[in-house]
UniProtKB/Swiss-Prot annotation:
InterPro entries named in the record: Phosphatase_YcdX_put (IPR023710), PHP_dom (IPR004013), PHP_phosphatase (IPR050243), Pol/His_phosphatase_N (IPR003141), Pol/histidinol_Pase-like (IPR016195)
Sorted UniProt keywords: Hydrolase, Metal-binding, Zinc
Gene Ontology CC terms: cytosol
Cofactor note: Binds 3 Zn(2+) ions per subunit.
Pfam families, A to Z: PHP (PF02811)
Record-listed Zn(2+) 1 binding positions: H8, H10, E74, D194
Source taxon at top rank: Bacteria
Annotated source species: Vibrio cholerae serotype O1 (strain ATCC 39315 / El Tor Inaba N16961)
GO biological process: bacterial-type flagellum-dependent swarming motility
Molecular function terms, GO-annotated: phosphatase activity; phosphoric ester hydrolase activity; zinc ion binding
Identification of the protein by name: Probable phosphatase VC_A0894
Length: 248
C-alpha cells in the first residue's frame, strides 16, 4: 500500500536522535511524503525536551522543503489512570499526540495493568494514536484495547522500526496479531517510521507490507493519503489546517 504520511518521527531534541527538523523534511521530500509528523519524546523520557519546546511549536512553518509539517509529540503514558506527561495547556498548539509506553517511565507490570492504562489513556481523550503496541514487555488485552480505540476514534500505530526486529525484540508476531484484531474491529490504523535519523524518515516499507498481508481496508489506514489523515484529525475534533486545504 502506498503511504503518504509518516506519523512518528524524532529530531535530535529527543536526546537520542540525530537529525534536525530541516534534515527530516528534506528526507521526507526525497522519500515522496506529502506530510510528516514531528513527534519528539515528551519530558519524562531521559534527555527529552522541556515543556516550552512543545508549547512553541506554533511557530513552525506549515511547509518545509515542500512537505507539510504536522506539529506533534510522543507522550509517555504515566500510570494506570491514563495520565500523559504533557500539560493540557500545550494541546491547542499541537495537531497530533501519540501515547506510548516506555520502560524508563512506565515500568512494565502485568497484562491487566497495561490494559487498564491504555484504556484510560484512550478515554482521556488527549491522544490521537497509540504507539508501538507490539512490545512484549507491555502485554495487554488486544481485543479490549482496540475495541476501546475504535469506539473513541484513536488510531493504532504500525511501527516500522519495530518490524525491523532490532528494537522491542519479540514484537513482530504481536504486531501482526494486533493488526488482525484491528482489521476485525474496523479500527483506524496509522503508520510511523519512528525515525531517529533523517535517512529513516518515510521508511514505511515493512508497515506497508504488513498492511497488505493482513488485508486492511485502505479507508481505515489514515496515512494512505494526506486527505485521509487530515480528515481523521478533524474527526478527532481538531480544527482544519487552512494551509493544507488543497492537499489530496
Amino acid at each position: 500500500m502506498k503511504l503518504a504520511v509518516d506519523t512518528h518521527t524524532h529530531t535530535y531534541a529527543s536526546g537520542h536522535a540525530y537529525s534536525t527538523l530541516i534534515e527530516n523534511a528534506r528526507a521526507a521530500k526525497q522519500n515522496g511524503l506529502t506530510l510528516f509528523c514531528t513527534t519528539d519524546h515528551a519530558e519524562s523520557m531521559p534527555g527529552a525536551p522541556h515543556y516550552w519546546f512543545f508549547s512553541n511549536q506554533r511557530i513552525l512553518p506549515r511547509f518545509l522543503e515542500g512537505v507539510g509539517v504536522i506539529r506533534g509529540v510522543e507522550a509517555n503514558i504515566l500510570n494506570t489512570q491514563g495520565e500523559i506527561d504533557l500539560h493540557p495547556s500545550v494541546d491547542h498548539n499541537l495537531d497530533w499526540v501519540i501515547g506510548s509506553f516506555h520502560e524508563p517511565v512506565f515500568h512494565p507490570a502485568d497484562k491487566a495493568a497495561h490494559t487498564q492504562a491504555l484504556i484510560e489513556t484512550i478515554k482521556g481523550g488527549r491522544v490521537d494514536a497509540l504507539g508501538h503496541l507490539g512490545n512484549p514487555h507491555f502485554d495487554f488485552d488486544f481485543e479490549q484495547v482496540i475495541a476501546c480505540a475504535k469506539a473513541h476514534n484513536v488510531a493504532i500505530e504500525i511501527n516500522n522500526s519495530t518490524l525491523k526486529g532490532h528494537s522491542r525484540v519479540g514484537s513482530i508476531d504481536r504486531c501482526y496479531e494486533i493488526a488482525r484484531v484491528a482489521k476485525s474491529l474496523d479500527a483506524y490504523i496509522t503508520t510511523g517510521s519512528d525515525a531517529h535519523f533523517c535517512l529513516d524518515i518515510g521508511g514505511l516499507s515493512l508497515a506497508s507490507q504488513l498492511i497488505d498481508e493482513v488485508g486492511i481496508n485502505p479507508q481505515r489506514v489514515i496515512t494512505h493519503t494526506a486527505r485521509q489523515f487530515l480528515d481523521f484529525l478533524e474527526l478527532r475534533g481538531r480544527q482544519p489546517i487552512e494551509e493544507f486545504a488543497g492537499l489530496l
